[in-house]
Swiss-Prot record:
Protein name: Cytidylate kinase
Annotated disulfide bonds: none
TM annotation in the entry: none
Keywords: ATP-binding, Cytoplasm, Kinase, Nucleotide-binding, Transferase
Gene Ontology biological process terms in this record: nucleobase-containing small molecule interconversion; pyrimidine nucleotide metabolic process
GO molecular function: ATP binding; CMP kinase activity; dCMP kinase activity
Cell compartment(s), UniProt: Cytoplasm
Known EC number: 2.7.4.25
Superkingdom to which the source organism belongs: Bacteria
PANTHER family for the chain: CYTIDYLATE KINASE, CYTIDYLATE KINASE/PANTOATE-BETA-ALANINE LIGASE
Catalytic activity: CMP + ATP = CDP + ADP; dCMP + ATP = dCDP + ADP
Record flagged with keyword Kinase: yes
Species name: Acinetobacter baumannii (strain AYE)
Length: 228
């Protein structure tokens, strides 16, 4: 049986995670949050004092990537994420861990180490994969390819609200600077830079609600022969 795959790529804070989860629930597909994998690897390397030694200890870092002890659990509150048995669901969503992930994602050998782990998520009846290079690198055969973007300013505003909702302090200028720096790093990295696939459906969510974007996505996905 053919596995149907929907990819959602785009920059940090564009709403990929929220909408990927909604699509996966709507179609009853599996869900891959590739950003979580990079955040988990970045957090693990930081805990083992290796994040600042990527060049000198690359082989060791690659081994950590291949053996990463992670688990995803679905609960009434959403998806819980565990690293080495510890619940790190909130931790991996902080700005600091986002910076760890961006550093890790810029290393070709570490991206390759996570490649097969991501491919393994493609199981029947289907998969919704959210990330930066799902359509261009990991699942180029995807049935439906979506590129979700938004202005840096609107993404910063959303991120501040998200962090404040988690009880964390957040300053708009700092968040905006971080987003702009991550965009630059993601778009300019040597391997799998952030960009839409040639055949991607591009949505700018700057002035749209989640429900409006979701409807656009469902209409597009259905037109690509994936049915509910």
């Amino acid at each position: 049986m053919t596995v149907q795959i929907i990819t959602i790529d785009g920059p940090s804070g564009s709403g990929k995670g929220t909408l990927a989860a909604k699509l996966a629930a709507y179609y009853q597909f599996h869900l891959l949050d590739s950003g979580a994998l990079y955040r988990l690897l970045g957090l693990s390397l930081h805990k083992h004092d290796l994040l600042e030694k990527l060049d000198s200890h690359l082989d060791m870092c690659v081994n950590y990537a291949r053996q990463l002890n992670i688990k995803f659990e679905t609960s009434a509150e959403g998806t819980l994420v565990f690293l080495d048995g510890e619940d790190v669901t909130q931790t991996i969503r902080t700005e600091r861990v986002g910076e760890y992930a961006s550093k890790v994602a810029a290393i070709p050998e570490l991206r390759q180490a996570l490649f097969e782990r991501q491919r393994a998520f493609a199981q029947t009846p289907g998969l919704v994969a959210d990330g930066r290079d799902m359509a261009t690198s990991i699942f180029p055969e995807a049935n439906a390819k979506i590129y979700l973007t938004a202005s840096a300013e609107s993404r910063a505003e959303r991120r501040v609200k998200q962090l404040q909702g988690m009880g964390l302090d957040a300053k708009i200028n700092d968040i905006l600077a971080n987003i702009q720096a991550r965009d630059k790093r993601d778009m300019e990295r040597e391997v799998a830079p952030l960009k839409p696939a040639a055949d991607a459906y591009i949505i700018d969510s700057s002035e749209l609600t989640i429900d409006q974007v979701f409807k656009l996505m469902v209409d597009y996905v259905n037109s690509r022969t994936v049915s509910n």
